[in-house]
Amino acid sequence: MNAAALEAEDPSRAGQSPLRWWILAGVWLIYMCFGLTASSLAPLVAPIIRDLGLTHTEMGSVLGAWQLAFIVSAIPCGMLVDRLRPRRALLVGAFLIALSGVARSFATDYFTLFLAAALFGVGGPIVSTGAPKVVSQWFTGNERGLAMGIYISGPFAGGVVTLVTTNAVMMPLFEQNWRAVLLAWAGLAALSGLIWLVVSSRPEARQKEANLASATKVPTTTEIATLLRLRPVQILLVMAVCIFMINHGFSNWLPEILRSGRMDAVTAGYYAAFPTIVAVIGSIVIPRYAVPARRVMMLALLATSAGAGTLLLFIDTGPLLVLGLFLQGVSRGAMMTLAMLLLIELPAVGDKRVGTASGLFFAFAEVGGVGGPLTLGLLYDLTHSFTAGLLMLAGFAAIILVCLWALRPYLKAPPTASLEHR
């Protein structure tokens, strides 16, 4: 069945179904709980280190544990999404995220906390690879960029909730019991799965998924190898590592970086939430204007913003610190979105390989997701300062600029002329 036949049989494929916005809202809610759970440990670093007797290096490895599991599971989960279909897959992902939150709340030492955090790395990639597949199914043309920006704002919104409310609201509410706070976040994740079940069970959604499943082929390991041989895919995967190195290193340690400048925990939480709020807005607004002809230029500006924002964190207080946090928020909110758009719109990817291509993207990206938090923690233990870690993150922003320079010829060339690795 070709695309034209699908549109004739399924009007929502042409972007005409009102249900697509409810579907997008359901995806956003799950992805918001993804971000909420991913960032839930960062504001609780101090009490967790104290109660469980951890070093900063051990805590850094815990913060990177789920990304480590993500690396191993992202590609299989991407293939699972293509095989199982995203409606069911996202439900499974939501409940695995909730289970990780519950397990964290019962951790008794470094090992159990590490395993609980790593469990998130099994549910997380199902959501990360399933979400772009849902968007590619329900949205086309200019709406696709908007929809991508909206759903990717979800994790940042979840980060805002945890950073703003953990020490200011939740910890006092639960009598400074960090375990109860983590359990509450797990309950929200489970609720998001139930809401998705209701929204995605509509007959129209079931029919659309059945139509698309009959028209697409389940990817194989051979197709993964084919994607990995494409030069633009290789470049984008290197960029993914750098983007996540910056995003995860920055977001996981930002409250502690600010506290090292003599801020109290509540004030640091408010300051740390500021770039996340900016990221929510940026992830929605910027992709709307990132038409294909502008994407490389806009990504270059965002990488420059990330590097400059990181360097400005050397200033403890004042307007320049706020500017640095703002620049970090702008870049964090949109870099991944634009890189994902470049990847899934490559001719060699197409709708049938979105899940697998997304799995590849996140499998490589989470190398940076692990390396960022772990390396910052290690460098702090070695130097008793975050200076070396911040300089490292600025260096990865520079690498993104080099990758964009290398990517440009392949985006300008005809699809069949220069995609293959030569």
Locate the predicted segments by residue.
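Helix-loop-helix hairpin linking two adjacent transmembrane segments in secondary transporters
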Residues: 150-201
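Cytoplasmic helix-loop-helix junction between adjacent transmembrane helices
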Residues: 116-154
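Conserved MFS/SLC helix-loop-helix module at the cytosolic interface between two early adjacent transmembrane helices
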Residues: 72-110
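C-terminal transmembrane helical hairpin of 12-TM major facilitator-type secondary transporters
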Residues: 293-342
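Flexible cytoplasmic inter-helical loops of multi-pass small-molecule transporters
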Residues: 198-222, 414-420
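Extracytoplasmic gate region of multi-pass secondary transporters
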Residues: 41-42, 231-283
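A late C-terminal transmembrane helix in Major Facilitator Superfamily
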Residues: 350-385
